[in-house]
């Protein structure tokens, strides 16, 4: 199954803290980074390793090192930026591609307004990051862009996912694995996840949430 709900106790605890209405912007932002790092740990478990001999303190020693495709992290603006530092804390050499998506609040369809992708995507593994996987429109559109640019290995990291969004992404891109900290109940009539986290972008950046 291409969707992985991470049940680690630390992940469950931190997502529980993020659900609280009274949590501060500072704490929400820090937790988004921390859960982003934990999701990265899970999503990278099958990365290839090679060996090399280095000079250690007591002489030559064989060590392991990452081997294979380089990584590009792809935050979906703006909320995806809230997870970026957490991902880069584990993969600091990764290059960052940026995709801006805006959702039509009436049709719930996603529209791309910004696309800044790194080069040689055919030789890179892409980690798309976005706190919320709701309808799946923004995620599908971003995956479409990456595949069109030549990227063939793509993984999605989200804090909370709705069943509707998971189904949409799996139908459109069955080869893309989704790593999520929680699978929630459903979407409401406005396309927001219930119980969800609220508007993740507003909660990360401290801007006013829509009623």
UniProtKB/Swiss-Prot annotation:
One of its GO terms (biological process) is UMP salvage. It catalyses: UMP + diphosphate = 5-phospho-alpha-D-ribose 1-diphosphate + uracil. It comes from the Bacteria. GO terms for molecular function: GTP binding; magnesium ion binding; uracil phosphoribosyltransferase activity. Binds 1 Mg(2+) ion per subunit. The magnesium is bound as Mg-PRPP. Its cofactor is Mg(2+). Pfam families: UPRTase. CDD domains: PRTases_typeI. Belongs to the UPRTase family. HAMAP family: Upp_B. Catalyzes the conversion of uracil and 5-phospho-alpha-D-ribose 1-diphosphate (PRPP) to UMP and diphosphate. This is Uracil phosphoribosyltransferase. It comes from Hahella chejuensis (strain KCTC 2396).
């Amino acid at each position: 199954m291409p969707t992985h709900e991470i049940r680690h106790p630390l992940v469950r605890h931190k997502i529980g803290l993020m659900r609280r209405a009274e949590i501060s912007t500072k704490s929400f932002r820090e937790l988004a980074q921390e859960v982003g790092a934990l999701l990265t740990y899970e999503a990278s478990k099958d990365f290839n390793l090679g060996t090399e001999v280095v000079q250690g303190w007591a002489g030559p020693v064989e060590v392991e090192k990452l081997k294979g495709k380089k990584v590009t992290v792809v935050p979906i603006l703006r909320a995806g930026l809230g997870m970026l530092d957490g991902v880069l804390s584990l993969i600091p050499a990764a290059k960052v591609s940026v995709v801006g998506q805006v959702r039509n609040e009436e049709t719930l369809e996603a529209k791309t307004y910004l696309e800044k992708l790194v080069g040689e995507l055919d030789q890179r593994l892409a980690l798309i990051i976005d706190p919320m996987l709701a309808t799946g429109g923004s995620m599908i559109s971003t995956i479409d862009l990456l595949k069109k640019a030549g990227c063939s290995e793509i993984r999605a990291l989200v804090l909370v996912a709705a069943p509707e969004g998971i189904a949409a992404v799996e139908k459109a891109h069955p080869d893309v694995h989704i790593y999520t900290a929680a699978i929630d109940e459903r979407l409401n009539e406005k396309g927001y996840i219930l119980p969800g986290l609220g508007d993740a972008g507003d909660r990360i950046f401290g801007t006013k949430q829509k009623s």
